[in-house]
């Protein structure tokens, strides 16, 4: 049976100059921060090849990450920690991280496109865009910044805790990851409200 393809209407850009895109990476992992990015692109300095970060190779991601940092007008990152995720839940922690990414920009955008189906509370108008990382260039750029940032942090965590395979699975739940936490337990960076982690901690 073929997969039903949904055609989304074209995204209409508002009549503003400073338009930002925001996306998140890391809602599903068992460990580490949820990381968000906010990007304002330069219309006079276009970047080709922007796409949903999940569909790009590691090499292409790294190249685009550098190009976005070089060519975009403004780039900022936000995050919410495992402690905040456990206290707020992953949805509210993600909204908080998105707010922080916008707040961390060195200039206030006039309008913000948010990936997904809801907007965080912001001081400027915003619009949520389903599948925005494939439909809005600013969101695509933000998804690349967020993903490369988080992936590199997981590679650093892998050096600290080499038995968990963080560099490979980036903290997401995999068979190898489950086996590692069953054998070695959890580190302080784990999200203790997530069911597989609760199970290891004997909280279920």
From Swiss-Prot:
What is its subcellular localisation?
A: Cytoplasm
Q: Which residues form a coiled coil?
A: none
Q: Which GO biological process annotations does it have?
A: DNA replication, removal of RNA primer; mismatch repair
Q: What class of enzyme is it?
A: hydrolase
Q: Does the record bear Membrane in its keywords? A: no
Q: How is the cofactor bound?
A: Manganese or magnesium. Binds 1 divalent metal ion per monomer in the absence of substrate. May bind a second metal ion after substrate binding.
- Top-level taxonomy: Bacteria, Pseudomonadati, Pseudomonadota, Gammaproteobacteria, Alteromonadales
- Which GO cellular component terms are attached? cytoplasm; ribonuclease H2 complex
Which GO MF terms are attached to this record?
A: manganese ion binding; RNA binding; RNA-DNA hybrid ribonuclease activity
Top-level taxon in the UniProt lineage:
Bacteria
Gene3D superfamilies the record matches: Ribonuclease H-like superfamily/Ribonuclease H
Q: What name appears for this protein in its UniProt entry?
A: Ribonuclease HII
What does the sequence similarity comment in the record state about its family? Belongs to the RNase HII family.
Q: What does this protein do?
A: Endonuclease that specifically degrades the RNA of RNA-DNA hybrids.
In terms of Pfam families, this protein maps to: RNase_HII
Q: Catalysed reaction(s)? A: Endonucleolytic cleavage to 5'-phosphomonoester
- Secretion signal, residue range per the UniProt entry: none
Per the UniProt entry, what species is this protein from, by scientific name?
Psychromonas ingrahamii (strain DSM 17664 / CCUG 51855 / 37)
Location of the RNase H type-2 domain = 17-204
């Amino acid at each position: 049976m073929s997969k039903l393809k949904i055609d989304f209407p074209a995204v209409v850009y508002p009549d503003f100059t400073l338009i930002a895109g925001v996306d998140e990476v890391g809602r599903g992992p068992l460990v580490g921060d949820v990381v968000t990015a906010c990007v304002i692109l330069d219309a006079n300095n276009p970047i080709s090849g922007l796409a949903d970060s999940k569909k790009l190779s590691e090499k292409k991601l790294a190249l685009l990450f550098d190009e976005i940092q070089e060519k975009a007008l403004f780039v900022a990152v936000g995050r919410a920690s495992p402690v905040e995720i456990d206290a707020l839940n992953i949805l509210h922690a993600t909204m908080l991280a998105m707010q922080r990414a916008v707040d961390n920009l060195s200039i206030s955008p006039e309008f913000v496109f948010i990936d997904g189906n809801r907007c965080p509370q912001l001081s400027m108008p915003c619009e949520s865009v389903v599948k925005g990382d494939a439909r809005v260039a600013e969101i695509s750029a933000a998804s690349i910044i967020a993903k490369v940032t988080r992936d590199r942090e997981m590679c650093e965590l892998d050096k600290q805790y080499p038995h968990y395979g963080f560099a490979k699975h980036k903290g997401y739940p995999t068979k190898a990851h489950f086996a590692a936490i069953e054998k070695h337990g959890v580190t302080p960076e784990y999200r203790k409200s997530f069911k597989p982690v609760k199970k290891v901690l004997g909280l279920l």
